[in-house]
Amino acid sequence: MLPDIEICRATPLAPIDTIAQKAGLHANEYESHGQHKAKVSLHCLERLANKPKGKFILVTAITPTPLGEGKTVTTIGLAQGLAKLNHSVMACIRQPSMGPIFGVKGGAAGGGYSQVAPMEELNLHLTGDIHAVTAAHNLAAAAIDARIYHEQRLGYADFERRTGMPALRIDPKQVIWKRVMDHNDRALRMVTVGRNEPGKNINGYEREDGFDISAASELMAILALASDLRDLRRRIGNVVLAYDLDGNPVTTEDLKVAGAMAVSMKEAIEPTLMQTLEGVPTLIHAGPFANIAHGNSSIIADEIATRLADYTVTEGGFGSDMGFEKACNIKAKASGKTPDCAVIVATLRGLKANSGLYDLRPGQAVPDALFAPDSAALQAGFANLKWHIDNVNQYGVPAVVAINRFPQDCAEELEQLVKLIEALPNRVSVAISEGFAKGGEGTKLLAEKVVEQCQHPTKFTPLYDSGIPLDEKLKAVAVKGYGAAEIALSDKAAQQLAKLQTQGFDHLAVCLAKTPLSISTDPAIKGAPRDFIVPIRELRLCAGAEFVYALCGSVMTMPGLPEKPSFMALDIDQHGNIVGLS
């Protein structure tokens, strides 16, 4: 098969006007950005307000290998399969971060004959939404240090007299707003800002700081969770940046930077319209990671798509313990929209990897041995798929297992896996998906199974009620969402929890950040572990996103580059064509 980028370039694409019309948008409801992408105006929702919503399908997966198991391929392939069955359909996916593109995982446009196109435009910058988030985030960071500098330079009374503004008296040791950038750079995890030459302070006041990747910014979560421009502005104004010398929260509104941050993101709130290789309209919007953020595309994109199409296919990052959990307990709470069907993507290689018999590590190629017949490893790793099926079932959402087929897969093992699934006591539909090799033709059976499941009523049940205390919410996700025995708060996290509860933040949701490579917080533990401890080392307040962010185990909010990063394969030829992007 040709490389993804060559398949994409060899496929004729429709003008974006044609795709917009196919989706049901009017000419004044979108603005073209080149030939193959457009920004969709939120004004279209005024026209569509009384139109019934279509079915909402959420694609999730087993616990993945470091290179992923084809969730985006399946999302796009399923959308194309539904179109082959003459259904009105749209797909919604996240905007890829350049961190993984240049790091380990490569692009995030799907692959083979189930891609969003042009894939190089999607993977590299798109319409600049991530850059807008980065700029707005770092504006707040600059505003904090500027305010500390001027208040301390002048003294609080003189500052108030000269500016007519109250002194915020920010405690430099309690600034909780880091800086961000859209690259993997471990050297920036811990930095010192405001350093000066001896005897000078023109660069500000020295303090410890750090960088997160832009996908982990609270503003990225806000972009994905806001319902409209007014809600975006409200949420940005609620962001807590620091605490003052008395321990009171200091918000963006206090700093009078919230309006400028919202202005920086005024175009980012509009989803970007593109197309699959088979012309299915696709909305790309927001890019929070699922391991260190809430891992789903935007509520706004879902709202537009479900008003326009009979079926909307979207995905939650990583396994069902990650993006799916957060879709059900964070996103659904904000949107009021719950899935009509879940698709659980499984692969032979992924299940064998979950047997614990193979050593797969980020940054290393998948060993060929993983594709060789190994019935014992498949049987052992099947426990992971069963866990994810049971996990989805507890939310009351009908499920279909999509076995994403690789060219190297053994036909006998595929048959063995289908039989294992069909023998489960809680009957679940299953289909082999060949979207990568065959596009929509390879996912028609999967599409039929999904349509059938969408007819069944859901009994959606989140893991916790919003009225219970934060510590009980954390425990609910760990125990019911992961199968843990208990959570273990570090001394720092326990102090932070007490402070958050005292300040009235018990009503917020919780977002646990952990490794995606295990259901537990230890990436080395494969399969379906139970009764483990979830160590929570730190809690971060995201008052604008309306959740408390719990850092579990050793997870980092700024990734690092591997020994052999993906960027080494990237180049550009004399005609401006990008080479080496996958």
Curated annotation (Swiss-Prot):
GO biological-process terms attached to the record: tetrahydrofolate interconversion
HAMAP family, per database record: FTHFS (MF_01543)
One Pfam family it belongs to: FTHFS
Organism: Vibrio cholerae serotype O1 (strain ATCC 39315 / El Tor Inaba N16961)
Keywords assigned by UniProt, alphabetized: ATP-binding, Ligase, Nucleotide-binding, One-carbon metabolism
Family of the protein in this entry: Belongs to the formate--tetrahydrofolate ligase family.
EC number: 6.3.4.3
InterPro entries, per the entry: Formate_THF_ligase, Formate_THF_ligase_CS, P-loop_NTPase
Catalytic activity: (6S)-5,6,7,8-tetrahydrofolate + formate + ATP = (6R)-10-formyltetrahydrofolate + ADP + phosphate
Keyword Isomerase assigned: no
Annotated protein name in UniProt: Formate--tetrahydrofolate ligase
Binding site for ATP: T65, P66, L67, G68, E69, G70, K71, T72
The keyword Ion transport belongs to this UniProt entry's keyword annotation: no
Molecular-function GO term, any one: ATP binding
Superkingdom of source: Bacteria
Pathway(s) this gene product operates in, as recorded in its UniProt entry: One-carbon metabolism; tetrahydrofolate interconversion
